[in-house]
UniProtKB/Swiss-Prot annotation:
PROSITE patterns: SERPIN. This is Uncharacterized serpin-like protein MA_2246. It comes from Methanosarcina acetivorans (strain ATCC 35395 / DSM 2834 / JCM 12185 / C2A). Pfam families: Serpin. InterPro entries: Serpin_CS, Serpin_dom, Serpin_fam, Serpin_sf, Serpin_sf_1, Serpin_sf_2. Keywords: Protease inhibitor, Serine protease inhibitor. It comes from the Archaea. One of its GO terms (cellular component) is extracellular space. Belongs to the serpin family.
């Protein structure tokens, strides 16, 4: 018996993609693991938009997923917001146990209207204009020509998620359909993600592709002077050393520490976004990762001090990552959505034979003296050699980083730098 499938492709910082087509029956592992310190029941059972904290929900999911995808001796990068947002569009069409499992894993409220209103507000905040940086999130739905979607689902996608519907011919022109979507992705990501959907992925069985993008390009409030960037030693988790291009600055930054780790805030121009770097005091990133929860991260931030000069050393880094998220999400309890015999996406279409077959994730980050991604800025730079500093933040071994929207408290990106490399991106 043939069933229909949902393939979810998510590009970190850039795209989340949902395909609905057909899949053969398969067996799904039902192990469930959740590693959050958040009260799930309180979050998902609220019926009030005012009481539902979508940023806390997103951030709780962030740490749950990180605990599943962290990899020893490898760089890590993903956009929890992109995944959270794309799956919210998907969640809007779920019912029954499929809905309940996704609610538990993503901290979505069971009352869909609460999530819809909260998401609309979040999207509006993220997309508000600011000349100091580029930050935009977008949604789009690409549907098979003449395929029936529920009118209410289409209306919700447009009104709450700003998701416009475009008909495409997956059956007769799968390659052209792939090119159309990939070119849209390339445009929305400033050409940083190209050919996201692989050749042959879209075919006659594809019914719907849902894309969610979040793109960020910002410059530091306090830029690093490229003239004092030097090649310095960086010690990997296994003890090996490598030479990396390392930036240095002495400036006033928000800084904190406890017995295990140091935390530093590097704000971006525009005052709305910051990168937070968490550096273990010893070269033991695995131990930090194993105990890195939303509660611990929040406590580190709460104990940060202001007004002191900090000597900062961090490597330049740029890398791309790819991951398949089906397995970790199943471990987090999203089981039925992947099972063609159990999935219930009846809110999307009258066709009841839909299921997710796989979730793909791509990621890109570029951190250098000017900021994150590619950006140009001018400004006077103080010669930090002449300044006395109180604290030292020397990232010469693996560390974690988060890019956060301070208006909402929402973590947009999270990653680990295990082995920094830098290649100037065009």
């Amino acid at each position: 018996m043939t069933k229909c499938k949902i393939i979810l492709v998510i590009s970190l910082s850039i795209l989340a993609l949902l395909c609905i087509g057909c899949i053969e029956n398969s067996t799904i592992n039902t192990k469930t693991t959740v590693n959050s310190t958040v009260d799930t029941k309180t979050i998902i059972n609220t019926d009030s938009v005012e009481e539902y904290d979508i940023a806390t929900a997103n951030n709780a999911f962030t740490f749950d997923l990180y605990s599943m995808v962290k990899n020893e001796d490898e760089n890590v990068l993903f956009s929890p917001y992109s995944i959270f947002s794309a799956m919210a569009v998907c969640y809007d069409g779920t019912e029954g146990s499929t809905k309940e499992q996704m609610s538990n894993a993503f901290y979505y409220p069971l009352n869909k209207l609460v999530l819809e209103e909260s998401s609309k507000k979040m999207i509006g905040t993220i997309n508000s204009n600011n000349d100091a940086y580029d930050l935009e999130t977008t949604n789009a739905l690409w549907v098979l020509e003449n395929y029936t979607l529920n009118e209410q689902y289409v209306s919700n996608a447009k009104n709450y998620y700003d998701g416009m519907v475009t008909p495409v011919d997956f059956v007769n022109e799968p390659e052209a359909s792939t090119d159309t979507i990939n070119k849209w992705v390339e445009e929305k990501t400033n050409e940083k993600i190209k050919k996201l959907i692989p050749e042959g992925e879209i075919g006659p069985d594809t019914r719907l592709v849902i894309t969610n993008t979040i793109y960020f390009n910002g410059t530091w409030v306090k830029e690093f002077d490229p003239d004092i960037t030097r090649t310095r030693s960086f010690t990997l988790s296994n003890g090996d050393e490598k030479s990396v291009s390392t930036m240095r600055i002495v400036e006033k930054f928000n800084y904190g520490e406890d017995q295990k780790a140091k935390i530093l805030e590097l704000p971006y121009k525009g005052d709305n976004l910051s990168m937070y770097i968490v550096l273990p005091k010893e070269n033991n990133i695995t131990e930090l990762e194993n105990n890195f929860t939303l509660k611990y991260y929040s406590k580190l931030k709460e104990n940060m001090s202001t007004g002191d000069y900090v000597e900062v050393w961090i490597p330049k880094f740029t890398f791309k990552t790819e991951a398949e998220l089906k397995s970790p999400l199943i471990e987090m309890g999203v089981v039925d959505a992947f099972n063609p015999n159990a999935a219930n996406f009846s809110g999307i279409t009258p066709d009841k034979s839909l299921a997710i077959s796989e979730i793909y994730h791509q990621a890109f980050v570029d951190v250098h003296e000017k900021g994150t991604e590619a950006a140009a800025a001018t400004g006077a730079i103080i010669l930090e050699e002449e300044i006395e500093y109180t604290w030292e933040f020397k990232a010469d071994h693996p560390f974690l980083f988060m890019i956060e929207d301070k208006r909402t408290g929402c973590i947009l990106f999270i990653g680990k730098v295990e082995s920094p490399e830098y290649e100037k991106m065009s």
